[in-house]
Amino acid sequence: MKGVVTSMTISEMAKALDLERLSGESDREIESCYISDLLSRVLGGCSPDDVWITVQSSLNMVAVAIMIDVSCVILPEGLTAPDNVIEKANEEGLTIFTSKESAFSLAVKISKIIN
């Protein structure tokens, strides 16, 4: 369909959603988004090139995100990550953002701008 965006870059999404970048410089494409805080569910349900929205801000979150090869991670509700997590994410090339919005609101907006 003409005028329908089927994917967009991380930078385009960040600008559209007014996200604050905590780590990473990647500008990968995003295909969809996935919301979960239970790492075992994320391993089974999140796909490469997804945006992962989670309140998890531990080193385990970074490991799971890298294992799945997500496009980026968004921490909702103004959450941030400890320095050691940001440092590890930068080492691994993982882009992490924070947003003041809820996970639900972010997912709805992402769905609207990529579909």
Stretches with model-predicted labels:
Residues A14-C33:
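An N-cap/entry alpha-helix motif that binds or orients negatively charged groups
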Residues R28-I30, L39-V51, Q56-N115:
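Feature captures the catalytic cores and cofactor-binding loops of soluble hydro-lyases/lyases
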Residues M1-S7:
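Short, Lys/Arg-enriched N-terminal segments with co-localized hydrophobic residues
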Residues S7-S11, S102:
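Short, structural beta-strand-to-alpha-helix junction motif
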